[in-house]
Amino acid sequence: MRIGILGTGNLATALATGWARAGHDITIGGRSAAAAEAIANRIGGTARPVPAVATDADAILLAVRWDGVTEMLTAAGGPTGALAGRPLIDPTNAVEHGVGVLQTEPARSAAEHVAALASGAHVVKAFHMFASQRWATPDASPVTVAMCGDDERALDVVGSLVRDVGGVPAVLGKLDRVRQLEEVAGFVIGLAFAGVDPRSAIPTLPS
């Protein structure tokens, strides 16, 4: 699969590495052309300017900080339909650093904001619950990757990419449920910064 990655940070690097290892063709671009080139050289991928990253991509990953989402999607041509028809993976967490409180408008999710800026793209919320290093190296114990999205084919594509890096995809619903999923991420982040293992706050199911 041809995957276009928008961003050059830790998550972009980790998923690019994992997907390249699984045999996918990776194209990457970001605000720093030098950073994109360095990642591409490391994984055997291709670096391109941001407007060209999604040109022939089968799926696109938006891996930037929340405050860079609008700038990146605009540069990639999202508002003019340049990403239309493809799965657009949104792993962003629109939360206050170290606190976990959502910074989006009430009743609006980060993924809905992404969808509004990416005309015609099939947005799938995924990869927003675990730290980037979880995806950088293979792990014998798979983790569940909760996902939301409106397009069944896009969910299938992203689900296969989740499996390629050692995750187990779990579709929780359409984008009208995604704010709930983002609130859970905020809860986990808040606990982690408070020095509490978030796993200890989730009840185990009876056997």
Regions found by a protein language model. Name each.
Residues M1-R42:
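NAD(P)+-binding Rossmann beta1-loop-alpha1 motif at the extreme N-terminus of oxidoreductases
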Residues A14, G18, L117, L161:
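Rossmann-fold NAD(P)-dependent oxidoreductase module
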Residues I28, A47-P49, V171-L172:
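A structural preference for short, hydrophobic beta-strand core positions in alpha/beta folds
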Residues A40, G44-I89, N93-G98:
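Rossmann-like NAD(P)-binding element
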Residues A84-P87, T92-T137:
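Rossmann-fold NAD(P)-binding glycine/threonine-rich loop
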Residues R134, V143-S207:
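Active-site-lining helix/loop region of Rossmann-like oxidoreductase modules
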